[in-house]
Amino acid sequence: MHYTGTIWRPPYEAYSLLVQVTAGCTHHSCKFCTLYEDLPFKFKLSPFSEVKADLAEASKYYRKIPRIFFTGANPFVLSTEKLKTLAKMVKEYYPFYKTIGCFARITDIMPKSLEELKELRALGYDGITIGVETGDDESLTFMNKGFQSKDVLEQCRKLDEAGISYNFFYLTGIYGAGRGEVGAKKTAMLFNQLNPKIIESSMLTIYKTSELYQEIQKGNWKEESEIEKLIELKTLVENLTINTRIVTDGASNLIQVRGNLPADKKKLIKHLEYQISNADEASLLELEVLCDIFDFSKPLLHRLG
């Protein structure tokens, strides 16, 4: 199998076959992100011969996998024709596959027409994961995400119309000190107009190699406290009114939260309120450092510097 650098996938894709079709990120400019700094290039498309060889190799061992996940930061940036070709390759080796997932940026959806998206859905593209992070335009601009909340609304409604389901990544702590609750409410207002199947929340972790760390050093941005991050997460849950699943499965999270909304809302809020009322900032900081220290490829958090 051809894999380049660290391979990232959502926790809920644990049972999908991971096939590399791209490596790196076309944007690669978010101030907080260090995920692809181990690569000597910004973005690369895998040769189709390699993709085909990987599918052939995997099919010798796993013949009945229903879902394929294309790796890379945003394979959905590829043209519709390339995505169709990749789906046909999957069909050749996995004739009974059901769906294909991948990461996508909002900007990857923009150039694709509704008819193109419907074609992709017919070939199995479904359950794509989008790193929205927040619905707060101020934070989207500061973190250099490359899109605004109105773009999220327009493009995800296009996915809805095409029948392609999607999941959102939400980044707790992205707003900075004193803005957590305001940002969470703005995000809930955006998400409530859409239909994410899963909202996967991760807590912002700041590495010394990130551009965001340099902003902190210059005094341009201040991190939320750990307790404020928990309050922010509670605020998001309180203000969501859609049918969705919210989870905090990633290693960066201080606590694990899993539930279906609106059915589990009261239970989740009660759990978060308990954690907040019993939280000690120093202990939470220590916990975050201990969680992070297992990633030996990264410098320690700036708090240890």
Label every PLM stretch briefly.
Residues 4-50:
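Canonical Radical SAM [4Fe-4S] cluster-binding loop centered on the CxxxCxxC motif
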Residues 107, 135-139, 159-183, 202-208, ...:
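Conserved strand-turn element in the central/C-terminal portion of the radical SAM core barrel
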Residues 17-19, 68, 98-104, 128-130, ...:
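Hydrophobic faces of well-ordered beta-strands that scaffold small-molecule active sites
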Residues 1-13, 192-305:
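Auxiliary Fe-S-binding modules of radical SAM enzymes
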Residues 25, 33, 51, 70, ...:
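Conserved, mostly hydrophobic/aromatic
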Residues 41, 136-142, 211, 255-257:
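A short acidic, helix-capping loop that chelates divalent metal ions and anchors anionic groups
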Residues 59-165:
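Conserved SAM/AdoMet-binding glycine-rich loop
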Residues 115-117, 176-193:
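Catalytic cores of alpha/beta
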